[in-house]
Structures are given as C-alpha cells and as structure tokens.
Regions:
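N-terminal auxiliary segments of SAM/dcSAM-dependent transferases
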Residues: 1-42
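C-terminal lobe and adjacent flexible extensions of AdoMet/dcAdoMet transferase-like proteins
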Residues: 15-20, 27-31, 214-272
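Class I SAM-dependent methyltransferase SAM/SAH-binding core
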Residues: 58, 63-65, 73-136, 161
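Hydrophobic beta-strand segment of the Class I
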Residues: 78, 147-148
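Class I S-adenosylmethionine-dependent transferase superfamily signal
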Residues: 92, 151, 166-167, 215
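A short glycine-rich, Lys/Arg-flanked "PGG" loop and its adjoining helix->strand segment in the class I
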Residues: 97, 160-175
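A short His-aromatic
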Residues: 154-155
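Short, glycine-/aromatic-enriched active-site segment of Class I SAM-dependent methyltransferases
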Residues: 182-202
Length: 272
C-alpha cells in the first residue's frame, strides 16, 4: 500500500463528502453516517454552530472540537490542517477576532470550494483557505500561533513529516492542539493495510505512545493526550459490512481500541 494510493483514496472519499454536504445529515470519518454518528455527535454546542452556514455543519468530518481545546486568543494566527468544509476555521476566526487570522489547509478541490462558499455565506473576512498537503504546509517558518486539526492527521501516510511541518510553521511558544483518532493496543496488520479503513480513520491511527514519541521527535514539549470517547466496534457494524469486511472476524480485534482524543503540545520558546 503506497502513500500515493492512500492519498488518492482519502481525496476521493472526502470529495464525495463535500458533494453530499447539501443533501445528507452529515458525514464523519469514513464519510458514512453509520460510522460517523458515534464519532461526530455532540461535538459542538448549539451556540457555536447556530450562526454558521448549514453546509459547514453538515460537512463536518471531525472527532472532536479543537477550537475549544486550543484556547484561542484575539489577534492570534491559527492554522487548521485538513480544514474540510471550514467549520473549525470559521469558529476559530470568531475567537481570534478581526486582528487575528484563521487559515484552512486542504488538498481536496471540492472541500476547498465548499469551504469558500461557507466563508462567503458567513461573511467572515479574516479567513483564508489554502490548497496543499499537510506534509508540505504552504506557509513560512514561525508564522502561526496555533495549529488545530480535527480527525485528519491519522489519514496521513507520513505523520513524521506532518509533525515536522507543524513544528516549522509554529512560532516559538506556539501551540499544537488537535483532535484525532488514537489507538490503544495493537491493530492487526491486515486491518491497517485496508485502504477504505484508512480513509475511515481507523487503519492509519497511531497508538497513543507512538503519537507522543513522534511529536517529541519533531521537537515538541509539554505533550499530552486526553481521551474523550472510546469507540465500540458494534457502532460500525453496518459500515464494515458495506465495505466488504467481515465484522465478526475483526470486531474483537478492534473493539475499544480506537478512541477520540485531544492532543496538546508546545513548540519551546526560544526555539528555531
């Protein structure tokens, strides 16, 4: 399974999600409501999403609420890795205010088009959506105060490069504050090789200790992982069936081993 193959599958799945945003009740990791509901429900309160365009909410593909985690302040510059339909970028733009800036980075043309449509409908000026990959962030060194991401880093085939790039663009003292899927315990190799499971935020998820080690190797300090939800295999029974995976065969191997988590880290002050 090559990195290119993984990227193509992910791009296609999330392009489909963008196109469906106006006609479905939502789509989470894996772009299938049967899988997404247990992962994505109750992430945002009504006050947060009430003023957002409906399509921004419907296209939400996350597993957490990094805008709440990040403790954004007025005047800060924030970057959302894998910004999708733009929900977290628009929420971040509110928090940093007119003196701040919120960037969204996505590799999928359909998602970028949807995000820019949502930005226009929301009437938010301090937002910019960039096309690119999270392994090669198109921003200069030391230019961002906070990096957020919502259930996207697990989709990358080169997470070490993602963390190095995040470290590079953060200012000294900058904060890494993401929601992601993390595993606890071994996931069988045949599951990790399944491209559709990768696009569904399962096969590519790092084990918690590996996530911590990779962040540290990139230079981050003050690393913490807080589990917010444990996912049971039964929640995804129908989705496994649809993609042709024998649920009864894999259920015991994955049950309770994937969790939604908040991951925090800091780029040291006085650093590069």
């Amino acid at each position: 399974m090559s990195t290119t193959d993984m990227k193509d599958v992910v791009r296609e799945k999330y392009a489909q999600a963008a196109l469906r945003a106006g006609t479905t009740k939502g789509c989470g990791c894996g772009c299938d409501p049967k899988l997404s509901d247990p992962v994505t429900r109750n992430l945002y309160d009504a006050a947060q999403i009430g003023a957002l365009p409906e399509k921004a909410v419907l296209a939400s593909l996350g597993c957490g609420n990094p805008t709440a985690l990040a403790e954004l302040k007025p005047g800060e510059t924030v970057l959302d890795l894998g910004s999708g339909g733009g929900i977290d970028v628009l929420l971040s733009a509110r928090r940093v205010g007119p003196t701040g800036k919120a960037y969204g980075l996505d590799m999928t043309d359909e998602m970028l088009a949807l995000a820019r449509e949502n930005q226009q409908k929301a009437g938010v000026a301090n937002v910019e959506f960039l096309k690119g990959e999270i392994e090669a962030i198109p921003l200069p060194d030391n230019s961002v105060d906070v990096i957020i991401s919502n259930c996207v880093i697990n989709l990358s085939g080169d997470k070490d490069k993602v963390f190095r790039e995040a470290f590079r663009v953060l200012k000294p003292g900058g904060r890494f504050a993401v929601s992601d899927i993390v595993t606890r315990g071994d996931i069988p190799a045949d599951i990790r090789k399944n491209l559709l499971l990768w696009a569904g935020c399962l096969a590519g998820a790092l084990e918690d200790k590996d996530y911590t080690a990779k962040l540290a190797a990139a230079g981050f300090t003050d690393i913490g992982i807080e589990v917010t939800r444990v996912h049971k295999a039964e929640e995804a029974r129908e989705w496994f069936k649809e993609i042709g995976v024998d649920f009864d065969k894999v259920a015991k191997q994955i049950d309770g081993k994937t969790v939604s988590a908040f991951i925090r880290a800091t780029k040291p002050r006085g650093c590069c």
